[in-house]
């Protein structure tokens, strides 16, 4: 590489959905992560190969609990000349926690396989950036998995959670909005 070649800054992603995509692909806490799918098989999104080629240094890996929806009804409504879709209903923690735990487990399996490091401090993040290791900040998008007494928050924090977006496109006990 010549001294005049442009230096590409490391890419740090403010949000990615790889955990929910892997979860939706049928992965769970009881099933092993399909490492081959993560290495090269995530069309249109991140995978290990795309991360490496694109200079991906790390990012916020979102844990997200989807709303149950009837896509046929939604598609019909959205094809009308004018439509108004209400926000999805609140999801109770007992429904959200298993999905969130499964996605957190996927992130931990990715770390155990050596593809990234879950960062829980700025020192860990800086070390990853300095050493070329993908830095993962565990993020919850919508605080549905967090109970009123914050027991689940403590559990997720111990698992590596360092960022929460309190609401997504539905209300929960902490707020409402998009």
Q: Which residues fall in each region the model found?
A:
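N-terminal hydrophobic targeting/anchoring segments and the immediately downstream early-domain regions
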Residues: 1-178
């Amino acid at each position: 590489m010549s001294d005049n070649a442009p230096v590409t800054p490391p890419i740090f992603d403010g949000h990615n959905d790889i955990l929910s995509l892997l979860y939706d692909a049928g992965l769970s806490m009881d099933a092993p992560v399909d490492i081959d799918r993560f290495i090269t098989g995530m069309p249109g999104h991140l995978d290990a190969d795309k991360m490496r080629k694109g200079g991906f240094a790390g990012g916020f890996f979102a844990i997200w609990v989807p709303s149950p929806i009837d896509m046929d009804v939604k598609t019909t409504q959205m094809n009308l000349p004018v439509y108004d879709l209400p926000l999805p209903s609140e999801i109770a923690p007992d429904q959200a926690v298993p999905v969130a735990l499964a996605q957190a487990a996927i992130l931990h399996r990715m770390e155990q396989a050596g593809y990234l490091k879950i960062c829980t401090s700025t020192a860990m993040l800086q070390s990853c950036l300095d050493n070329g290791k993908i830095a993962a900040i565990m993020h919850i998008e919508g605080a549905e998995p967090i109970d009123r007494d914050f027991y689940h928050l403590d559990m997720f924090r111990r698992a590596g959670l360092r960022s929460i977006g309190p609401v997504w496109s539905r209300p929960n006990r902490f707020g409402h909005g998009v």
